[in-house]
């Protein structure tokens, strides 16, 4: 693995924009184009027992592995991964990884809330026992205290995953006041050496690119994985742009990404989606970040025709322990509160 690696998660995190309905041919083409652009890791979607194999929220690896197998014709270190949400894990749905063939899903990104750490440990062990690389994805890492981060590191050191992530679920982290540097330093100083550190950001404060560049330039021998999407595709303000971060790494002579192929992919397969489903910076999603609130609260208030000023006041009414996960009942109570 390179020291700095880009994980494109367009087909998974970008799917919140179009309900993961990219279409079979477009799924094939996007994976093919990303592979030929020399992306380090491609996230191919969610493994979901209630999913549909015509989308990138699929219920088995059969279809997606057949696509990967049809594409991978050249020598490459590119890896293919899928995400599983802890509460949707079904052991029968995850097959044993039967061979050392890299041209298939070989890594699982497991998301979990810190209240579910014991269940997470149990399922993480199952995933590792089935032969997959494990990517630990703690939802809203910003909400962890230093003690909780150190406890999580202890769990990771015992599990020996491939990657432990810093996940900025609500796009509220910055370099100083929410201390991305502090969290990274805790991980870097205490994780065993062969565990990579990942960073998954959301662009609500327009800081995804700057923060990613800061991490890339940290002096450490540890491998770092940066998540991004084509054209920043993602709900609300979107994500770090794959085309921008690949350009940055190429300019610094760290990456060897095919930038023309990347922008061709955007024009052919992502721009048409954006024409019908907009994403990107907006004041309401800036407010969700500045109030450290789940963006679905903002979506709910917008659906109820609230102004920007009203949204900010409503977000401030939500108790801190209710902000990190959307609760429709709480949102309605805020609106009805006089």
Task: For the regions a language model picked out, list residue spans one by one.
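Catalytic cores and adjacent flexible loops of soluble metabolic enzymes
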Residues: 1-338
């Amino acid at each position: 693995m390179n020291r700095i690696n880009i994980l494109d998660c367009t087909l998974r995190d970008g799917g919140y924009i179009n309900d993961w309905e990219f279409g079979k041919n477009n799924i094939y083409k996007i994976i093919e184009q990303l592979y030929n652009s020399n992306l380090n890791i491609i996230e191919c979607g969610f493994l979901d027992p209630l999913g549909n194999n015509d989308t990138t929220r699929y219920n088995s690896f059969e279809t997606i592995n057949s696509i990967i197998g049809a594409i991978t014709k050249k020598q490459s270190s590119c890896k293919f991964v899928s995400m599983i949400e802890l509460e949707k894990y079904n052991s029968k749905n995850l097959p044993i990884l039967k061979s050392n063939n890299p041209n298939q899903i070989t890594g699982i990104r497991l998301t979990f809330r810190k209240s579910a750490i014991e269940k997470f440990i149990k399922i993480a062990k199952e995933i590792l026992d089935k032969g997959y690389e494990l990517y630990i994805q703690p939802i809203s890492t910003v909400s962890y205290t230093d003690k909780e981060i150190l406890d999580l590191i202890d769990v990771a050191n015992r599990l020996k995953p491939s990657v432990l992530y810093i996940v900025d679920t609500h796009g509220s982290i910055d370099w100083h006041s929410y201390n991305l540097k502090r969290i990274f330093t805790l991980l870097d100083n205490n994780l065993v050496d062969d565990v990579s550190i990942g960073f998954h950001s959301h662009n609500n404060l327009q800081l995804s690119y700057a923060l990613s560049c800061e991490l890339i330039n940290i002096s450490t021998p540890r491998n770092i994985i940066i998540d991004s999407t084509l054209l920043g595709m993602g709900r609300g303000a979107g994500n770090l742009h794959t085309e921008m971060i690949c350009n940055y790494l190429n300019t610094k002579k760290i990456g060897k990404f095919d930038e023309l192929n990347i922008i061709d992919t955007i024009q052919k397969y992502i721009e048409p989606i954006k024409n019908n489903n907009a994403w990107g910076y907006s004041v309401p999603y800036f407010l969700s970040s500045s109030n450290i609130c789940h963006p679905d609260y903002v979506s709910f208030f917008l659906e109820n025709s609230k102004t920007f000023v009203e949204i900010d006041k409503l977000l401030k009414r939500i108790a801190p322990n209710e902000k990190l996960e959307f609760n429709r009942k709480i949102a309605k109570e805020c609106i009805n509160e006089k």
